[in-house]
Amino acid sequence: MDPVLEALKKELEIEAGRDHVPIIRGPERSLLLSAAEKASPKRILEIGTAIGYSSLLLAERFPLAEIDTLEIDPVRHARAEEVMRAAGFSQRVHCHLGDAAELLETLEGPYDFLYLDGPKGQYLRQLKAIEQKLSPHAVIAADNVLFRGMVESDAPVPHRYRT
């Protein structure tokens, strides 16, 4: 284990808890990395960078992979860029600032692994926008699809939580 990366991860976990920044936790973290391993990714696309925690995990696990990660919030984007520089990953983890709907049009594929971690209501639209840029055997992971058990519930799901 790299002590610099371990310290960065711990720092981000504390920061996320303090500032209420959603980051992947516990069992979901293991599921994400297991799903990505199935793709043996050379290129990864993450939609929803936040402060860069998931990108850091993916860059650490896949040291040869190029990663494009998209974030709409300028403060979180700046923090993610800072994290990638501190980790020594800024040459292969590219943090893009802007709305995913616009940024997806500018990206070049193919991507072997897609991680949807932005607004749940946009997942289908984002998937359709990037579908042609995925490699034939790409693996797709979507965070929060079981958000608060709503997928399993018989109750109507509020629009903003639909995927």
What do these predicted ranges mean?
Residues V21-L104:
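SAM cofactor-binding core of SAM-dependent methyltransferases
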Residues Q122-T163:
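C-terminal substrate-binding/active-site "lid" region of AdoMet-derived donor-dependent transferases
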Residues M1-I24, E37-K38:
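Rossmann-like AdoMet
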Residues G118-K120:
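Switch II (G3) loop of P-loop NTPases
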Residues D99-T106, R125-A129:
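Short internal loop-to-helix segment that lines adenine-nucleotide cofactor pockets
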Residues K42, I67, F113, K133, ...:
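Hydrophobic "anchor" residues on beta-strands that sit immediately upstream
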Residues E105-L114:
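A short acidic, Gly/Pro-enriched loop at the edge of an enzyme's catalytic core
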Residues R61-F62, L107-E108, L134, A138:
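A generic alpha-to-beta junction signature in SAM-dependent methyltransferases
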